[in-house]
């Protein structure tokens, strides 16, 4: 686990007026690489969140090869947010899934983008829906039952419109029902398994103009959102995407609530 950003000292008082200055710890789960554009954006986004919005995140990179052990040790559960980043195929599918499960079960604000979206659906299908045999084609191309399959048309370098369902977390986070987003992926969910996901409580709350799923969320969770597109690639990194900012807001709120709970003990 490596530090990605040194946060400035902040007042730890948990009151509503001080929540903005509460430092939140965020786990960046992924196999950090200088060749992955979204990874290079992270320091810029963290700086912009702190300077523009007063949202201070103390970020730590956790390689997927370490994530399962960090989850088992309870380390991940002590973070205020978990972001499973692009960069698949991951070194450890199990590690990525373990990080997602901890965030989902522990009520920790969560964002999964691109590969993080794909593995969010995979974790939910296996753990919640009981579809233990479903696979990701990038990790296991010969598997007989693919939940995540090659897209008919690659979305590498693609930009397209996404529509969020009214009243969804996706719409709230985006601040609009319609948004133009950036992609860099070649895999997406197989339609035949989507009914099982929704039957077990996952909400598929954003679609492209052809009706293909692009956003998933979990009702009842404080903040659990996954997008096939990469919000971190919007602009030049100096103005965080609304979804990235929404994650930061949720993380700071989680940190403030945790601090209040500790103070009350």
Whereabouts are the PLM-identified features?
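An anion-binding catalytic pocket shared by soluble metabolic enzymes
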Residues: 183
């Amino acid at each position: 686990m490596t530090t990605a950003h040194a946060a400035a000292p902040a007042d730890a008082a948990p009151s509503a007026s001080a929540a903005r200055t509460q430092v939140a710890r965020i786990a960046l789960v992924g196999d950090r690489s200088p060749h992955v554009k979204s990874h290079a954006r992270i320091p810029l986004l963290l700086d912009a969140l702190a300077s523009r919005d007063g949202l201070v995140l103390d970020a730590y990179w956790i390689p997927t090869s370490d994530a399962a052990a960090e989850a088992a040790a309870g380390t991940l559960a002590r973070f205020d947010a978990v972001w499973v980043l692009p960069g698949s195929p991951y070194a450890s599918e199990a590690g990525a899934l373990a990080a997602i499960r901890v965030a989902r079960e522990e009520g920790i604000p969560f964002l999964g983008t691109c590969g993080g979206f794909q593995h969010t659906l995979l974790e939910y299908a296996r753990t919640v829906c009981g579809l233990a045999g479903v696979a990701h084609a990038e990790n296991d191309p010969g598997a007989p039952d693919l939940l995540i399959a090659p897209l008919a048309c690659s979305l590498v370098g693609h930009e397209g419109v996404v529509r969020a369902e009214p009243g969804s977390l996706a719409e709230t986070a985006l601040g609009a029902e319609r948004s133009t987003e950036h992609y860099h992926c070649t895999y997406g969910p197989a339609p035949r398994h989507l009914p099982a996901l929704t039957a077990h409580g996952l909400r598929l709350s954003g679609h492209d103009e052809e009706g293909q799923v692009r956003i998933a969320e979990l009702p009842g969770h404080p903040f659990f959102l996954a997008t096939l597109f990469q919000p971190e690639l919007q602009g030049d990194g100096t103005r965080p995407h609304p979804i990235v900012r929404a994650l930061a807001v949720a993380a700071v709120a989680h940190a403030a609530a945790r601090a209040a709970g500790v103070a009350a003990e």
